[in-house]
Regions:
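Charged, alpha-helix-forming regions
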Residues: 9-339
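Extreme N-terminal basic, low-complexity initiation segments
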Residues: 2-7
Length: 339
């Protein structure tokens, strides 16, 4: 496998994503070529090194004070930034695609709220080791769990986006030449939401609760990306900034894993690739790439306030965004943006 970002996925990431496949829980179509042995038949030593490096990096970050977690596939492929006004949406890299099929009654989840919701779900599932999540007795109680103000904007968005998210269907697809692996993921198996949006502080007799789908629970608790929830909260005015933060944390995490397992220590990401991964609403032209790049770098300045050590491990070139291994886990960082 190519270790460069031309392939958009590192070896260990592909292994992590394909682990359910190797265990027989993913559907797969395979062209029986050399690619199969390259992608799926890593030597036991290679797998051992990668898995050990993942575990070490994860434990380092966990011990350093992670306050939140996010599924690795949601750090690579993102939700819509704005209402796409459609029932189907997909985004991703050349190797990984996240697609979302919205419930026709509730619409597509978009913006900052479902990003915070997904991070909270993952964090709670990791913290409690349970797929059963309590949302509280009213909306205000749940807003406090998300550390959001209990004003009209958030109350309305919370109700609409929570229902849109938990009633949507996710699909994650990983592809390489000759290999396709995919899995459909149900976010919530069942749930009871008793909120009255007109009376957000009115307590109900019962807790609102969700039971995560087994596939989603497994996906979000298997080697999730450690992060700081405080950073996501602070960056919530820009869904793109939230996406850049989680992606940067994830990519630095994977580079450190790669370095620990004796593999690649640098990733060169083409700007055109980042535009496909993050940028909706930009023209498919050189000017569209330049516009995306300018906005990405603008949002990155705010992101680096919450991951200052990463400054020393990133470079910008006309054609690429370059990341290098060595940045400390984000959870070890001292936030310098307390404003």
């Amino acid at each position: 496998l190519s270790a460069g970002y031309g392939s958009m996925l590192s070896d260990w990431t592909l292994l992590l994503l394909l682990t359910p496949l190797l265990n027989g829980s993913l559907v797969v179509r395979v062209s029986l070529k050399k690619t199969l042995s390259e992608v799926l038949m890593l030597s036991k030593r290679q797998r051992s090194l990668i898995e050990e490096a993942v575990a070490l990096e994860f434990e380092d970050a966990k011990a350093s004070g992670a306050t939140g977690y996010l599924p690795h596939f949601l750090a690579q492929a993102t939700l819509p930034h704005k209402d796409p006004k459609c029932m189907y949406f997909e985004r991703g890299t050349s190797n990984l695609t996240l697609s979302i099929l919205a419930h026709p009654k509730y619409g597509m989840p978009y913006g900052m709220m479902p990003r915070l919701l997904l991070a909270w779900m993952c964090t709670e599932a990791c913290r409690t080791s349970s797929p059963e999540l309590s949302l509280g007795r009213n909306q205000n109680e749940f807003l406090k769990k998300l550390q959001l103000p209990s004003d009209g904007r958030y109350i309305k968005a919370l109700h609409a986006q929570t229902v849109a998210l938990i009633r949507s269907q996710l699909s994650v697809e990983v592809s390489k030449t000759g290999v396709l692996a995919f899995e459909s993921i149900q976010i919530a198996k069942n749930g009871f939401v008793f909120w009255n949006p007109n009376k957000p502080d009115e307590e109900c007799l019962w807790n609102s609760n969700l039971t995560l789908g087994s596939d989603f629970y497994d996906a979000i608790t298997k080697a999730p990306v450690p992060l700081k929830m405080e950073a996501l909260q602070a960056l919530r005015q820009s869904p793109l900034a939230m996406d850049i933060y989680t992606w940067l944390v994830y990519r630095m995490f994977t580079l450190n894993v790669a370095a620990r397992s004796g593999r690649n220590k640098e990733a060169k990401i083409p700007w055109v690739g980042l535009k496909c991964q993050f940028g909706g609403g930009y023209e498919e032209t050189p000017q569209g790439v330049r516009s995306f790049k300018a906005n990405f770098l603008k949002q990155l300045r705010g992101v680096l306030l919450y991951y200052p050590d990463a400054r020393n491990y990133i470079e910008e070139t006309p054609e690429h965004f370059v990341l290098k291994a060595g940045a400390r886990p984000v959870v070890q960082q001292r936030v310098v943006a307390g404003r």
